């Protein structure tokens, strides 16, 4: 924990190499303060320097700034995210203390000078909300989170009272599958509400599901054990914002709340606490007047608009100014280019403070709503700092790429299939790419609101569960002939087609017979059938595999078609190792199945890439895929700030995965002009797409999965409920742990694979993982009792680069424990075994040509006889920053090290280490010339 105090204004000289003015001209309606960090929450309060802005950053650093831009101090706290901060004076000195509800399970109290006052915490379950409530002359700190308790804490940090939600909650459970206990909840928000007589009450917003329930209000008298009132919430979906306002200035607070949702469900509400009445307004009513897609949190304050009190709602990149009617149809709408993480009203000045832009911004913005030009100033606001830098860094790469020529020594680029790009947004760019390059390949993608209505009674006579399943999003109206005509037409004047062909809700949207006919009509052109969220258990699902998926895969393998299995959660490192999926693992259908992911709500991205690549390296499949959607950042569905308008995070995600060998890309078509840089990098050969036998950044140590432990399999795929925490059960160590809905942003445990193998420290968004000692694959078992019988995939080393032939080391797990090959010895996840694995990863990393540390993601592949291609990527998914990649050469001697785009050269020091800068939001492609062809070297000489 570090604190830095600054006594004078800090010049904003960013690591990105440019100097940004700290504050805009004083006469402007908007002033911007550079922080050099991605600011996710803002508050205001009185510090020794006067009224000040309090910020918390993506990584949990709390800092204070004067309104003139002077930085007062910062405190790094735990290094984990703060789910909530609250600012209030608790000791009567006129200066505020700052309270942070941290994902490490603690509440931190920070003094007004930035020093730590106290820490409160009973476990490592994330704290989610914190506030202060007054009762006459007493003040209490109140906090709660995912352990389902509400805590009263003294102003000195001592526990005064614990209130278990099970003593008063009315939250119900619903749906199929394993469900948590009913009548319990997690604390989504806790806030004080003031009355005109000076008294306060405590409002707790409790919920048990991050996606499908808005929860309830529970209203307490200060320090009471039970609520005096309860109320349902009038809007649907998880609530992402709750705050108090006083619209009519009568001294009695009202509550404004907004949900965390996509546009179809987006809504705001205001609650009168006198009678618990609520007014609501559906933002979807004005969807045509705002940008429709994206996942946003609606945040509502009250401002004076031309002398009239008005509700101001920040909704992504839009501000809605709504009159007293609270009807958004009457709103004035202000549009900016970017979306912002948070908004706070400073009551002493009536100014609004915006947190950083979600696309990688680093500034906070102060809006003076008393300035007549503030509306136009907001619409014209162009954040500087990191956001400007990452866009300039992208443009610099584009300029360098225009002069790049692929070395003649390298083979032709492998085809990379973009299976869902929109030809409507930038058709000429796609046409140009198709004219100039053989790769990437763009398929004709069809969305299917209407699907086949076929007679399932005979084919599925013995499977009534799936015979009767339907997806509510689809209209079952087409005949087989109509379905055929609609899709087969896509082959005309194209390289192939792609479409949703089914879903976990209904795998049979298109009958097997019709789909075979469609594929045949393509005459060998590529067909990709997308199957999202395929997950099932028991005899009924086994029949789906044997009657539909495996026969379709056999037919596909003979007709240049693929099944793009877009599964969720931990499927590729848990469910895939269940007995019913043995045929996919066997390798007999390797050219048909493409493992892919839909990783919204997930917090285990570093594992999923290791799982997909493990099946690929093992020979179970010949290809693997990746997907980007607007809600990829939605690891916490209760706070879906997933409206990034510059998809730099997505660009880096896709580049890292393609550099790792992914060749089937399922992107949501958004800002394709920006994303098209990836197409050009592939087409010109700057982004090297490796075969699996060319990769050299894989650790020789791999974790092999036997049939998954049933509790691990179930809990790691059950992520929407927030109330599964059980102290006794959660104390049991697992190799893959803290994966259900209880743990957003939580720290990973030392014995967890994510921690010791991937260097992933939190359950959040590691889409671009570091793996500093080499990517540790999660694979099928290679030897011993748990090895699959009757496979044709060969051994792992058979499919990998020749250097791996005699250096591989396998450790076997079921997700909970470790096992020796004969199954006679079982070792707990937190036993000495994990330390042995960690040490072995370190030891074996010296056998790799190189390893990379320093917060940059990396991939190495052999690109030619005596050349290696090193791809370096800024790993900060939503908080990009300058990185320094420390490249350590181990088993090779570099002759020359050159950036293939910029031409910059590098030389290692006497320890064989070279430091290569990676700019914020950027990536580099480095050619390393070596003395020998690694394919001819014996592993014993490495």
UniProtKB/Swiss-Prot annotation:
Main subcellular location of this protein, as a coarse class: secreted
Domain of life: Bacteria
Cellular compartments annotated: Secreted
Listed GO biological process terms: cell wall organization; polysaccharide catabolic process
GO molecular function: lambda-carrageenase activity
Pfam families hit by this protein: Beta-prop_CGLA, CGLA_C, CGLA_M
Known EC number: 3.2.1.162
Signal peptide bounds: 1-25
Reactions the enzyme catalyzes: Endohydrolysis of (1->4)-beta-linkages in the backbone of lambda-carrageenan, resulting in the tetrasaccharide alpha-D-Galp2,6S2-(1->3)-beta-D-Galp2S-(1->4)-alpha-D-Galp2,6S2-(1->3)-D-Galp2S
InterPro entries per record: Quinoprotein_ADH-like_sf, WD40/YVTN_repeat-like_dom_sf
This protein's record includes keyword Isomerase: no
Keyword Signal found: yes
Keyword annotations: Carbohydrate metabolism, Cell wall biogenesis/degradation, Glycosidase, Hydrolase, Polysaccharide degradation, Secreted, Signal
GO cellular component: extracellular region
First-level EC class: hydrolase
Self-association state and partner proteins as the record states: Monomer.
Role played: Hydrolyzes lambda-carrageenan with inversion of anomeric configuration. Does not hydrolyze iota- and kappa-carrageenans, agarose or porphyran.
Protein's name in the database: Lambda-carrageenase
Species annotation: Pseudoalteromonas carrageenovora
Gene designation: cglA
């Amino acid at each position: 924990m570090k604190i830095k105090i600054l006594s004078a204004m800090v010049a904003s000289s960013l690591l990105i190499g440019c100097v940004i003015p700290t504050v805009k001209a004083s006469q402007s309606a908007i002033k911007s303060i550079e922080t050099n960090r991605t600011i996710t929450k803002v508050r205001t309060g009185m510090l020794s320097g006067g009224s000040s802005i309090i910020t918390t950053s993506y990584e949990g650093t709390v800092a204070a700034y004067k309104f003139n831009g002077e930085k007062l101090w910062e405190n790094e706290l735990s290094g984990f995210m703060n789910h909530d901060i609250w600012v209030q004076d608790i000791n009567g000195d006129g200066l505020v203390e700052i309270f942070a509800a941290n994902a490490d399970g603690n509440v931190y109290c920070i003094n007004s000078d930035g020093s730590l006052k106290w820490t409160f915490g009973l476990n490592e379950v994330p704290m989610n909300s914190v506030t202060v409530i007054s009762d006459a002359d007493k003040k209490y700190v109140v906090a709660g989170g995912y352990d389902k308790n509400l805590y009263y804490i003294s102003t000195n940090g001592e526990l005064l009272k614990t209130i278990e939600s099970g003593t008063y909650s009315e939250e119900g459970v619903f749906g199929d599958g394993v469900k948590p206990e009913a009548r319990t909840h997690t604390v989504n928000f806790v806030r004080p509400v003031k009355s005109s007589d000076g008294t306060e009450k405590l409002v707790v917003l409790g919920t048990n599901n991050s996606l499908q329930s808005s929860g309830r209000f529970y209203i307490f008298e200060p320090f009471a054990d039970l609520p005096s009132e309860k109320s349902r919430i009038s809007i649907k979906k998880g609530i992402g914002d709750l705050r108090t306002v006083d619209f009519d200035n009568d001294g009695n607070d009202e509550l404004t709340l907004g949900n965390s949702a996509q546009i179809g469900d987006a809504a705001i509400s205001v609650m009168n606490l006198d009678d618990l009445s609520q007014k609501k307004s559906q933002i979807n009513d004005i969807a045509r007047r705002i940008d429709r897609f994206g996942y946003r949190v609606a945040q509502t304050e009250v401002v004076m608009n031309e002398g009239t009190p008005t509700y101001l709602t920040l909704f992504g990149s839009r501000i809605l100014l709504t009159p007293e009617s609270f009807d958004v149809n009457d709103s004035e709408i202000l549009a900016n280019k970017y979306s912002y993480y948070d908004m706070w009203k400073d009551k002493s000045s009536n100014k609004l403070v915006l947190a950083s832009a979600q696309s990688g911004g680093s500034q906070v913005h102060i809006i003076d709503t008393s300035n007549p030009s503030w509306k136009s100033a907001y619409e014209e606001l162009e954040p500087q700092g990191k956001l400007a830098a990452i866009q300039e860094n992208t443009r610099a790469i584009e300029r360098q790429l225009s002069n790049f020529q692929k070395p003649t020594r390298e083979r032709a680029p492998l085809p990379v299939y973009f299976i869902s790009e929109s030809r409507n947004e930038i058709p000429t760019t796609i046409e140009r790419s198709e004219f100039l390059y053989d790769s990437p390949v763009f398929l004709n993608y069809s969305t299917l609101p209407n699907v086949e209505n076929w007679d399932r009674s005979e084919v599925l006579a013995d499977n009534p569960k799936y015979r009767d399943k339907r997806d509510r999003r689809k209209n079952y109206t087409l005949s087989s002939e109509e379905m055929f005509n609609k899709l087969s037409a896509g082959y005309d004047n194209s390289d192939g087609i792609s479409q949703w062909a089914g879903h976990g809700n209904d795998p049979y949207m298109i009958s097997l017979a019709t789909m075979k006919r469609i594929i045949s009509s393509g005459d060998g052109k590529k067909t990709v059938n997308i199957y999202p969220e395929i997950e099932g258990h028991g005899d009924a699902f086994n029949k789906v595999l044997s009657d539909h998926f495996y026969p379709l895969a056999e037919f596909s393998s003979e007709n240049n078609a693929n099944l793009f299995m877009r599964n969720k959660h931990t499927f590729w490192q848990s469910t895939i190792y269940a007995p019913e999926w043995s045929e996919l693992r066997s390798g007999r259908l390797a050219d048909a199945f493409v493992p892919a992911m839909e990783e919204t709500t997930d917090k285990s991205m570093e594992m999923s890439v290791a799982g997909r690549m493990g099946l690929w390296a093992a020979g179970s499949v010949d290809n693997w895929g990746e997907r980007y959607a607007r809600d990829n950042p939605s690891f916490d569905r209760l706070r879906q700030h997933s409206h990034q308008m510059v998809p730099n995070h997505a660009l880096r995600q896709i580049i890292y995965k393609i550099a790792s060998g992914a060749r089937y890309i399922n992107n949501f078509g958004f800002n394709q002009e920006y994303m098209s840089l990836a197409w050009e990098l592939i087409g010109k050969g700057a982004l090297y797409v490796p075969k699996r036998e060319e990769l050299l950044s894989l650790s020789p140590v791999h974790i092999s999965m036997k049939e998954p432990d049933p509790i691990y399999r179930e809990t790691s795929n059950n992520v929407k409920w927030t109330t599964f925490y059980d102290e006794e059960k959660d104390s049991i160590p697992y190799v893959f742990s803290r994966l259900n809905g209880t743990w957003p942003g939580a720290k990973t445990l030392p014995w967890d694979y994510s921690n010791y193998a991937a260097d992933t420290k939190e359950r959040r968004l590691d889409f671009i993982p570091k793996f500093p000692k080499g990517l540790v694959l999660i694979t099928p078992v290679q030897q011993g009792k748990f090895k699959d019988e009757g496979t044709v995939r060969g051994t792992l080393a058979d499919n990998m680069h020749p250097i791996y032939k005699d250096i591989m080391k396998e450790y076997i797990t079921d997700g909970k424990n470790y096992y020796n090959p004969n199954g006679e010895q079982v070792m707990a996840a937190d036993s000495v075994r994990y330390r042995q694995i960690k040490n072995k990863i370190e030891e074996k990393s010296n056998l790799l040509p190189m390893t990379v540390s320093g917060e940059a993601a990396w991939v190495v592949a052999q690109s030619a006889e005596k050349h290696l291609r090193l791809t370096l990527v800024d790993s900060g998914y939503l908080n990009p920053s300058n990185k320094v990649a420390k490249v350590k050469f181990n088993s090779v001697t570099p002759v020359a090290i050159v950036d293939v785009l910029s031409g910059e050269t590098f030389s290692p020091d006497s320890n064989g280490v070279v430091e290569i800068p990676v700019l914020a939001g950027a990536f580099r492609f480095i050619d390393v010339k070596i003395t020998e062809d690694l394919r001819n070297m014996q592993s014993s000489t490495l």
